[in-house]
Amino acid sequence: MIKVLECEMSVIGALLCSDNDEALQTAFSRISPKAFSDESLQEIYKAIVKVWQETGKTDCVLILKALPEEYRARIPICMDLVPAPSLLPHYTAMLMDQQR
């Protein structure tokens, strides 16, 4: 379970750090909130998608404002798991593999 949670958190972290529009579009087209087993990560993912759809960016300040207080502490933890935003396609593929 820890590896699953770490993978899910890495996807969130990579989404938050990435500025690659193509990688973000691909990830958003492949991932649904149900791909996350953790409810807080589902809600964070929904907030990321909403902000991205409204602004074209994954702006952390706007995402934090869109989230209930209890989920906000997860954001920096997720971001710390990601050594490079360019790994978003890799983390997306890992998350999709877990769904099989």
Spans of features found by a protein language model:
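Noncatalytic partner-interaction/assembly domains of nucleic-acid and motor enzyme complexes
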Residues: 1-98
